[in-house]
Amino acid sequence: MLGKISLLLLPVFVAINLVHSSPEIIKNLSQNFCKAMDQCKQELNIPDSVIADLYNFWKDDYVMTDRLAGCAINCMATKLDVVDPDGNLHHGNAKEFAMKHGADASMAQQLVDIIHGCEKSAPPNDDKCMKTIDVAMCFKKEIHKLNWVPDMDVVLGEVLAEV
């Protein structure tokens, strides 16, 4: 009887563990994604105000509108080879990036699906940087719905410790 109960509860414990670990995984993904920032900052001559935009990205009520922030995100995504030359998500590379930084196959696919859905739902825009902002804000909204948002105090503390 105890064995049957344990088997029934196993998926619950696994699901609880996934929920608790998801913000940590998103934190790892964010930190590793931003490792390309130094190169992009120099290449695009990005001001500190845009860096502040990117640090505030995960805050629930924060809306990123600066075109250069979209350019910076697109630059980092390009450097990490997770987008194609047109700026669209490269599904295989993005999934591989997520798995390399802590996501299991299921979570990695879910992240790819979220971004792909955001690409499809974003209004048409010939400006790649502004299109990237629309996709990023949609992605953030979906991550908030899943309660996967990383603790920004921890993220900022770790980023500042590396500087």
From Swiss-Prot:
GO biological process per UniProt: response to pheromone
SUPFAM superfamilies linked: Insect pheromone/odorant-binding proteins (SSF47565)
Gene Ontology terms for molecular function: pheromone binding
Membrane among keywords: no
Upper classification of the organism: Eukaryota, Metazoa, Ecdysozoa, Arthropoda, Hexapoda
Tissue: Antenna.
Signal sequence range: 1-21
Family that this chain belongs to: Belongs to the PBP/GOBP family.
Described function: This major soluble protein in olfactory sensilla of male moths might serve to solubilize the extremely hydrophobic pheromone molecules and to transport pheromone through the aqueous lymph to receptors located on olfactory cilia.
Keyword Methyltransferase: no
Name of the molecule in the record: Pheromone-binding protein 1
Keywords: Disulfide bond, Pheromone response, Pheromone-binding, Signal, Transport
Top-level taxon of the source organism: Eukaryota
Family matches, as Pfam families: PBP_GOBP
Disulfide bonds, paired cysteine numbers: C40-C75, C71-C129, C118-C138
SMART domains in the cross-refs: PhBP
Source organism of this protein record: Antheraea pernyi
